């Protein structure tokens, strides 16, 4: 029984998905009250003795409350456990913004238990603020101003709370290429101006633990020097992960935790480490050594989702103080990281104090109610009832904006189990605040029935009565423990109740009693289940006109098939045994070219209903009937000697009949026969009417054809020779005329111009002088 404590508030948490009138109980293989409760949120169990009749299964006891009452089950005998919620309020004297402190839920599968959570924003709640600054060279002006901020930051916190503390940390990037220049000289002084004193690059340095000493803040921050790196994105997510993962080193208290992230550029995230050959995923653990993140070159950057989970787990609210050009980038980041804000930082960070105050007021005035990770068997939904009259229903987390100090808001939390669960707990909290609600979850799957009875008259003295059902002793089975197993196992007994080695006993519609199926009595009116394996019934047959087998007048259903009365036929007894609609004018059923089914012709392929007379796509059988036509009409052809036997199915008509098919084919002598085919009832049965006259064409004159062909060839040859001779003569004549013209043009004398004398005379000039 559920514990009864006067100091606990008991809330009924049944949240049905449908109204009572539309509730249904879908049950399958139900034999106990627990099985029934697990079947659905609307199922109830009747524990009344002898509630089930002969052949009725124990699952009859499982139904909706309304159905059980209508079947005669007394209301006191109906077992219907409900999901419940018990809450314990916060202890007096403790400042709590979230109540109640503890909730115990008893969950029935499919039914939700609901309870209210109240949040009241307190004034002056303690705050820890950690200032995380980008020390890349582009932030040189900002560092000079931040060094003077210690007193202003604490004064700003004291305006909000009586207990405020501040801390400081800085970051640059991983110290490998391509993120920083790894040249030894550049590692000593990464700044572009060599005259400027800079510190070597680093991933994250924890400078000052959270403190309320503003002088110490200014002293420690004043010692910081600017640094530098190569690429534009910085290693800020690496630093934020260490701030969240190292609570003892940072000095976080269990109060409101703010992380101010100041930068003028973007950020590296998971996967970027591969550029520097860093392949190991970020493990989300603390790796500070001497206040330095020395393992940064061993682990990749964290993903945004991983960082968001770690910040929420550590209850840290980030405030991104970024320059104007980066505001939109970090606004996208706040959509993924809950309870985070963005503020526009001036170029020299002079407005950082006002930025933090504005962001804190924005964060603290919005409340997100959420829970830690749950198994798939538990579902949680939130209804938010905010002070500004805004309501949200069935959301994955509670959400209220514009929450004012000391003005309570209410969230209704609904928890549903999808099955009978093990005892477990989970925590609900308002993100960014320290208070939590512990929820303890217990299963509500057992029925508180009357105590078990060993009444011999009910269970034959061989078992006990539990929730109206006999639980038999070893060696006995049956509804009233009437069957003795004689040492046989239940598997052996059930084997004879399975059809064709099926895994379902008695087709799922009966109980195996002493190795035989006892079929259930169906909930469906007039339905009877029968058969050796309860495989048959009288309703699962084809229907006609909305009735099984067309109704009792047409036929009855026997084990899935209709048995029709004498006047009807068909798979659903939908047809009258008549052929009137299938007879043609000659009284032949479907013209002999089909079968009559349900008084409608089912024609042979090609023929068309309603009477299978026409076959538009069938080939004309003219050529096939040409031999019979020739022998019947002209007593000649290939069938002339046995015409009556070969053409007995074809009748010769003396006069033409309209509507026949005209044919024109050659006979055995080459003459054309013209005849008309008229189809009779049946396939390939025709009458034929033949024209009296044949069209015989005289044969060709072979001698004339041959003589003409030879003569034509000879004449063509002679003509071609004459043409060739004429062309040759014309060509020779043209050449002769050209020769005559050339001869007339020549100027030759009697000497041959080509002749050269064989003697040469040479005159000596000196001979003449002498």
UniProtKB/Swiss-Prot annotation:
Ca(2+) 2 binds at residues 173, 229, 231, 233-234. The keyword Isomerase does not apply. It is a single-pass type I membrane protein. Residues 23-701 are extracellular. Pfam families: EGF_2, EGF_integrin, Integrin_b_cyt, Integrin_B_tail, Integrin_beta, PSI_integrin. Ca(2+) 1 binds at residues 138, 141-142, 264, 347. The modification Pyrrolidone carboxylic acid is found at residue 23. It is found in: Cell membrane; Membrane raft. One of its GO terms (molecular function) is amyloid-beta binding. Its main location: membrane. Mg(2+) binds at residues 136, 138, 234. Glycans are attached at residues 50, 116, 254, 501, 642. Residues 725-770 are cytoplasmic. Residues 1-22 form the signal peptide. GO terms for biological process: cell adhesion mediated by integrin; cell-matrix adhesion; cellular response to low-density lipoprotein particle stimulus; integrin-mediated signaling pathway; leukocyte cell-cell adhesion; neutrophil chemotaxis; phagocytosis; positive regulation of leukocyte adhesion to vascular endothelial cell. The modification Phosphothreonine is found at residues 759, 761. Residues 449-482, 483-535, 536-574, 575-613 form the I-EGF domain. Both Ser-746 and Ser-757 become phosphorylated when T-cells are exposed to phorbol esters. Phosphorylation on Thr-759 (but not on Ser-757) allows interaction with 14-3-3 proteins. Residues 24-74 form the PSI domain. Keywords: Calcium, Cell adhesion, Cell membrane, Disulfide bond, EGF-like domain, Glycoprotein, Integrin, Magnesium, Membrane, Metal-binding, Phagocytosis, Phosphoprotein, Pyrrolidone carboxylic acid, Receptor, Repeat, Signal, Transmembrane, Transmembrane helix. The keyword Repeat applies. Disulfide bonds join 25-43, 33-447, 36-62, 46-73, 191-198, 246-286, 386-400, 420-445, 449-467, 459-470, 472-481, 483-514, 497-512, 506-517, 519-534, 536-559, 541-557, 549-562, 564-573, 575-598, 582-596, 590-601, 603-612, 615-618, 622-663, 628-647, 631-643, 671-696. This is Integrin beta-2. It comes from Ovis canadensis (Bighorn sheep).
